[in-house]
Amino acid sequence: MQELNESIYDHPKYYDLVFGADCAAETKFILGCAEQYSSRPAKRFFEPACGTGRLLYSLARRGHDVDGLDLNPKAIEFCNARFKRHEMPYRAFVADMSDFRLRKKTDVAFNTINSFRHLPTEAAARGHFESMAGAVRVGGLYLLGVHLTPTKATPSEGESWSARRGHLTVNTHMWTNSRDPKRRVERFGIRFDIHRPSGSVRIVDELVLRSYTMRQMKALIDHSGLWEIVETFDFGYDLSDPITVDAASEDVVYVLRRRQNKVTGK
């Protein structure tokens, strides 16, 4: 099998398939949170690190206005091409999620699959929350999914899954390469094994992510003083089953509400 050492984000067709399995559940969860926790009906939705825009497209099909950004031009091109094919307006653009501005404030923002952890430093992470505060209206929501590092349980070391669309099959494997708690850097190997009638190819990449314990994440959210945690869920996206985040928690979706006034002294 031919092996390519390339970024998985430079292959949006395969990425879209691999991470598209939960799209219906995620869309239902996003809309459910908007209905349950937003201060008024949500019409505009925004996704930082939108990738191929699968969730943006799912929401747009339901009649919502959407915006998205991503650092990878190939992902944005793929995202906007899908909207264009379906003769729908698109506004996904290339930008850094730690420093950006939206032309119009959104009602609900979401980043559900751990992309936030690509920001390498505390300064970048704080910049993200400041930028998000500028993007989300007062009383609006930010749904942030993060894979935390547990401090009272053994962290997960890997996972595998498969996805298929027509004659295309992608088998995905992830594994831990290293963890450095002091530097807060975790390295994960990821592999796409791609099988088509014309042949097979393997794409191998390494993801370098900043780590967060429960306490570190709470401190980061509190730092800007512009967000309050109104509820937390796991990656099962079950609105009837919120969780309490503790030292054993790993997969967490924070439902954050934009405050009207900045809270200081935390």
Regions found by a protein language model. Give the residues of each.
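Conserved class I S-adenosyl-L-methionine
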Residues: 1-43
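SAM-dependent methyltransferase
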Residues: 146-219
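A short glycine-rich, Lys/Arg-flanked "PGG" loop and its adjoining helix->strand segment in the class I
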Residues: 126-138
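Conserved beta-strand signature within the Rossmann-like core of class I S-adenosyl-L-methionine
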Residues: 139-146
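Conserved SAM-binding loop
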Residues: 79-80
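Conserved SAM-binding strand-loop segment of SAM-dependent methyltransferases
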Residues: 85-97
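Conserved SAM/SAH-binding beta-strand->alpha-helix loop
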Residues: 72-74
